[in-house]
Amino acid sequence: MARYRGPVEKIERRFGVSLNLKGERRLAGKSSLEKRPYAPGQHGQRRSKISEYGLQLREKQKAKFMYGISEKQFRSIFQEANRLEGNTGELLIKLLERRLDNVVYRMGFATTRRFARQMVSHGHVLVDGKRVNIPSYMVLPGQKVEIREKSKNNPQVQRSIELTKQTGIAPWVDVDQAKVFGIFTRLPEREEVVIPVEERLIVELYSK
């Protein structure tokens, strides 16, 4: 299944929760979810009862849309989490948080993961001084992530940095906003990752 490229706010309305797919609009109170807190379509205001499988699938879909990855990528990350020793659900979230596009987002250099992914793909991001244009690159604790010199004054990047003064920065990264770089200091604890996803249901889905 390819990555979704349609209207992102319809996705949030479908699930009834904010996935921060339109970061600045959400902060300004202009997201369509706040205006119309029900699913899109003729019968959107009716919430039908969801089966156990439906709930499990829903959680997987939320995680996929939130992190902006395809089914193939998501399954691959899950398989890696399942291979490692420990709580598979928590390991899944930690692996998702290590993706370079997500780290750029968590450091506050992009208002959304989608913009962060574009920044990485277009070669605007360096890891330990070397350009990396693969959004799925797994960042290791201690690695330095920065916006390349020519892109540091990009209006969208600067706007993103300003907005982090309202939202704050993830506690597992150390950021120098003036120099537009950060250090991925450690893996996050599960309780630190505030996302509307019950990873336990995803594990149950893939365990069938």
Swiss-Prot record:
Any one GO molecular function term: structural constituent of ribosome
Keyword rRNA-binding set for record: yes
Disordered: region residues: 30-51
CDD domains: S4
SMART domains with a match to the protein in the record: Ribosomal_S4 (SM01390), S4 (SM00363)
Keyword Ribonucleoprotein applies: yes
Gene Ontology CC terms, in alphabetical order: small ribosomal subunit
Sorted UniProt keywords: Ribonucleoprotein, Ribosomal protein, RNA-binding, rRNA-binding
S4 RNA-binding domain mapped to chain residues: 98-161
GO terms (BP aspect): ribosomal small subunit biogenesis; translation
Source organism, top-level taxon: Bacteria
Family: Belongs to the universal ribosomal protein uS4 family.
NCBIfam families: PRK05327.1, rpsD_bact
The protein's role, per its UniProt record: One of the primary rRNA binding proteins, it binds directly to 16S rRNA where it nucleates assembly of the body of the 30S subunit.
Subunit structure of this chain's protein: Part of the 30S ribosomal subunit. Contacts protein S5. The interaction surface between S4 and S5 is involved in control of translational fidelity.
Protein name, as recorded: Small ribosomal subunit protein uS4
